[in-house]
Amino acid sequence: MAKTPLFRGSCTAIITPFTKTGVDYEQLERNIEFQYENGTAAVVACGTTGENATLTDGEHSEVVRRVIHAAKGRMKVIAGVGGNNTERVLRRAEDAKFMGADGILMICPYYNKTTQ
C-alpha cells in the first residue's frame, strides 16, 4: 500500500520579526504571504530560526495562530514546540494542534543528560 507524504514541496523555516517593542505581527503576516506567492508548500513557525527559545508562551501561541490564519489553508504549517521543559513542550504541542497546525517540530532536550 502506497503512503501519501504529509508534506511535499519546499518548506521554509521562517523568522519571527521584531520591532523595538516586541513581535512584529504585521510583518510576520506579510512574510507568510511572500512565502505563498513564491511557491512555498509549508512553513515552520517558531523553530530555532523563529526564536522559539526566546518567545514567551503568549508570543509563541500568537505567532503560531497568526501564521495558521495567514496561511489560510494554502500552505501547511508546522509549529516548532521544542525545549527543555517537558510540560511546556506538551502544552505548546496541544495548543498547536488545537489551533490547526498540520504538524509539530520537536527536538530532544538540549543540555540535559538522558538516561538512554
Task: List each model region and its residues.
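Active-site beta->alpha loop and helix N-cap motifs at the rims of alpha/beta catalytic domains
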Residues: 2-12, 16-116
